[in-house]
């Protein structure tokens, strides 16, 4: 890692093994093979000059000793795994020809090339609308169970944390100030910062009493537009 990205007291461990100052060979064995990452905005991660299928195929060839045909077949299988529709056609699409949700699915497919133990998802749904957010979260939950991997989900959206996470860590100024079972932390937050975050959540609107007498009632209203002759 670049020296400016951490202090002398920094430590990053995975399975009890220190990653900071690890050799290049050790890092290469980790990246993609054991730990993969999905970023917030897929358009900044995908190469706009190459078809998405070729980009997945390249990842397969980089990490596996297989033929180009086998790599393409694996890329198509990965696209099916992340529930891309019409994979044969989408394989030959450029990033700008896909929707935001489809591009994020492509990024997830690339991250899963080597079936990693840990998938780091950094705000993976922030750039998506609410409906697509739910689809991507459902997909990630499904893949987590099918592949037996862990997901480190980084987000500022408390609603997503409550819905998606089993365990939660609350960070303030780069330090973990509270961690525990998601339900426990949300129901009984102990740290003042966690309490402030939860208190800042928008409260749902009150139910409207539809049984009260309406102030005004209009029926059988028609609108007509004169068309020029």
Which role does the model predict for each range below?
Residues 6-18:
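Conserved ABC transporter NBD signature motif
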Residues 113-117:
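A short, proline-enriched helix->beta-strand linker immediately N-terminal to the Walker B motif
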Residues 93-98, 102:
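Conserved ABC ATPase signature
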Residues 161-163:
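A short, surface-exposed alpha-helical micro-motif characterized by mixed small hydrophobic
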Residues 167, 179:
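Short, glycine/charged-rich "phosphate-handling" switch motifs in NTP-dependent
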Residues 18, 70-89:
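Conserved ABC ATPase "signature" region
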